Every structure is written in C-alpha cells, then in structure tokens.
C-alpha cells in the first residue's frame, strides 16, 4: 500500500499547486497540471500532499520529466497503471510554509479570498470570492453586498498594483481600490 511508511502529516495551511492528470504508460507515471506561475516550480515545493477518501496522504516524488507538451511524474510506490489511475484528478497540495516569501506587492490568491474591497472614498464593493487569470493581469471577482446601491451582484476588478489596487491589508482583510462602484 502506498504511504504506509510515511507518517501522514497534515498541511496546516493547505495550498493547491496543481493536480494529477491521466496515467501515462504502464509503469505508474502520471501527467501533472501545474498551476504555479512557472510550471516546473511545482517540483520545488516538497513534500506534496493529496487527499483521498478525506484522508491526507503525503506522496514522494521520485522523478519528473517533460513529455511532448506535458509534464509527467513518477511517485514512489506507484508502479503500475492501476495505482496511477487511482490518483487521477487528485489535487497536489503543499503547506503554505513551504512557499517562498513574497516580494512587496505580490500576494497569494488564497490570501486575498474573503477580503473586503473598498474604494478610497469608503464605498464597500463587496468580498473577494474568486480570482481569474486573463493573461495580461489577474482579476478580482467580487461578490457585492446584498443591498448594493448600484444593484450589482458581482464586480470584476483588475488586480493592477498601484493603478487600481491602492492598498492590501491582510491583517484587517481589506483591499483599497481606485474603482468606480458603478461598475
């Protein structure tokens, strides 16, 4: 059985860095989809955790390589297609303490979730419920308050530091923006 020899630790602050795709070949290799900015960075953060049947398991990366357009991985103890297929669609999770400290002005998406977004004039635009990548910049998806004066349900505000985003205060969970509340 996989993972028996490892004491299953639990990531204190789980962060999803990617997910496992379909099996590749017959020796237990799997495709991997990385959501890190540079796809290969996902291999820098170890150990990986996965959740199966509501249990955390630590998995050990044995090796990885490029194959055509894909990244494929070999996990320790996963030696055939059947074992690999059990992991398809499992999210790859690390503890946030394994991630590098960010530079000023950079934030992890997970830290912005649930933040209250207000304009410089003090108008409450709502709460961050999601983030979107548009290619040129990230976009905050903000769920407006029930009694929004403009009758808006959801706002999309570009995460442009300095230009739109004036201040991010993670201690008070607020983001101050220069944005017209009518949008």
Curated annotation (Swiss-Prot):
It is found in: Cytoplasm. It holds the Pfam family PRC_RimM. One of its GO terms (cellular component) is ribosome. GO terms for molecular function: ribosome binding. Residues 104-183 form the PRC barrel domain. Keywords: Chaperone, Cytoplasm, Ribosome biogenesis, rRNA processing. InterPro entries: PRC_barrel-like_sf, PRC_RimM, RimM, RimM_N, RimM_N_sf, Transl_B-barrel_sf. GO terms for biological process: ribosomal small subunit biogenesis; rRNA processing. HAMAP family: Ribosome_mat_RimM (MF_00014). An accessory protein needed during the final step in the assembly of 30S ribosomal subunit, possibly for assembly of the head region. Essential for efficient processing of 16S rRNA. May be needed both before and after RbfA during the maturation of 16S rRNA. It has affinity for free ribosomal 30S subunits but not for 70S ribosomes. NCBIfam families: 16S_RimM. Belongs to the RimM family. Binds ribosomal protein uS19. The PRC barrel domain binds ribosomal protein uS19. This is Ribosome maturation factor RimM.
């Amino acid at each position: 059985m996989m993972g028996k020899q490892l004491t299953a630790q639990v990531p204190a602050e789980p962060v999803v860095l990617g997910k496992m795709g379909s099996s590749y070949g017959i020796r237990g290799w799997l495709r991997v989809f990385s959501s890190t900015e540079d796809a290969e960075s996902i291999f820098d953060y170890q150990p990986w955790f996965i959740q199966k049947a509501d249990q955390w398991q630590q998995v050990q990366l044995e090796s990885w390589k490029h194959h055509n357009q894909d990244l494929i991985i070999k996990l320790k103890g996963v030696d055939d297609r059947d074992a690999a297929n059990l992991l398809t669609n499992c999210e790859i999770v690390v503890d946030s303490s394994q991630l590098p400290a960010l530079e000023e002005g950079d934030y992890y998406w997970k830290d912005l979730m649930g933040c209250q977004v207000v304009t410089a004039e003090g108008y409450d635009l709502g709460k961050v419920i999601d983030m979107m990548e548009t290619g040129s910049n990230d976009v905050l998806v903000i769920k407006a308050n029930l009694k929004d004066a403009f009758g808006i349900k959801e706002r999309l505000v570009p995460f442009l530091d300095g230009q739109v985003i004036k201040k991010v205060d993670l201690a008070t969970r607020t983001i101050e923006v220069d944005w017209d509340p009518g949008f």
